[in-house]
């Protein structure tokens, strides 16, 4: 018996409210912006792309990315799995799907930033193959990179 199939899907007028209602655990809320804010920001950044994360037919998370400062890298701008759906492998599978799509588009690097802290995403990203670059942004976020 296999688990649910994880997919990345467009967010539509019919699904946007459901996606905006997804939230990480309360203790994680300071690490990622609400999905509604992310979707609004993406509409003002023509290079941004975003998708809902589904497990079978159930929305379980959100992912957003954009090209980095060079043409070889793509930046994971936002990533979240609803608290009710964490620990089921959906996040790991969603990142794998995203990385596969980057490779298919010719990117050579995936980059992201995170805020350090308890219950933060650092360990999760390490487990997906990302490595710390040693760089820290002005807002305190630390950068990670994965060679595709």
Report the location of each language-model feature.
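Conserved beta-strand segments that form the floor/walls of ligand-binding pockets within enzyme
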Residues: 75, 80, 111-113, 143
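Glycine-rich acyl-CoA binding loop
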Residues: 87-92
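Conserved beta-strand-loop-alpha-helix junction that forms the acyl-donor binding cleft
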Residues: 112-122, 138-141
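Conserved active-site tyrosine of GNAT-family acetyltransferases
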Residues: 125, 130
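Short beta-strand-to-coil "C-cap" segments at the C-terminal boundary of structured domains/repeats
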Residues: 145-148
């Amino acid at each position: 018996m296999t688990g649910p199939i994880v997919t990345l899907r467009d967010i539509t007028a019919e699904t946007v409210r459901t996606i905006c209602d997804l939230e990480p655990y309360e203790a994680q809320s300071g690490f990622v912006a609400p999905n509604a804010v992310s979707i609004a920001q993406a509409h003002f950044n023509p290079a941004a792309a975003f998708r809902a994360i589904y497990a079978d037919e159930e929305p379980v998370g959100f992912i957003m990315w954009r090209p980095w400062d060079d043409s070889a890298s793509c930046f994971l701008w936002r990533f979240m799995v609803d608290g009710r759906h964490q620990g089921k492998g959906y996040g790991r599978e969603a990142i794998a799907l995203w990385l596969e799509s980057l490779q298919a588009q010719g990117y050579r690097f995936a980059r992201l930033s995170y805020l350090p802290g308890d219950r933060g995403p650092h360990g999760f990203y390490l487990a997906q193959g990302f490595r710390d670059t040693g760089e820290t942004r002005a807002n305190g976020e630390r950068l990670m990179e994965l060679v595709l």
